Amino acid sequence: MKYLRSLMQQFVTACKNQAKLIQQFTLSLLYLLIIHIVALLFFFLFRLVLFTSIDYQFPPDIQNNFLMQATAFIKGLWFDNVIACYILLLPLVILWITALCNYHSKWVFRFISIFFILFYSLSFIISAANIPYFSYFFKTINSSIYNWFGYGATTAGMVLGETSFYFPIFLGLISILLLSGSVLRLSSYFYHLINSKSTSISPINRLCIFATG
């Protein structure tokens, strides 16, 4: 009877701790969601700059068709969201595991920050390079760009010698800097916020929490 009572008390405590863990994981999801939205805003900016830079090349029926232009931006948002979701997958799994284990170390948030900065920087570089590339070839960057790697000096001369490329380069660099600063600030803020709500959970209670979902 005492054993059953003790087990019930542990189960009740586990349910209370589960609510705290859910709150912590909700904050982790909010942290990832904000970074996701910020990244989508930058992707939208790149698409807007690309659209305005090549608007003169469109036929009149497309230039005056707002519905078609809006549909194109929505499809672009869908594509950008797919890319951002792929980037988001690993941090989401990591934060789910750390929330389940009630382990919220600074190095975890630091790793996630570096991960986001690296992959979004690569994405922004491609998005920025796509602006002059599309202006020249009227198609987005694809695997054919690797053909230019064999002419490094020539390619560098074309990029640095063309003044119209300066703005996309500047846009890419400033986007990387702004996103990096935002990610680092958000990581620091949510790290302290989540740890302020942390609680001590015994292994038995943790098993009960895992069993109850």
Protein language model features and the residues they cover:
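Cytosolic-side transmembrane helix boundary signature
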Residues: 101-102, 174-210
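Hydrophobic cores of alpha-helical transmembrane segments in multi-pass inner/ER membrane proteins
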Residues: 83-95, 170-185
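Alpha-helical transmembrane segments and their helix-start/interface "positive-inside/aromatic belt" motifs
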Residues: 23-38, 107-118
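Residue-level signature of transmembrane alpha-helical entry/exit and packing/kink sites
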Residues: 27-35, 168-169, 202, 206-210
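Membrane-interfacial interhelical loops
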Residues: 46-79, 112-172, 193
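N-terminal-proximal low-complexity accessory segments that begin disordered
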Residues: 33, 37-50
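Membrane-interfacial, low-structure loops and terminal tails that flank and connect transmembrane helices
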Residues: 2-29, 107, 189-204
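N-terminal helix-rich structural modules
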Residues: 78-97, 107-119, 123
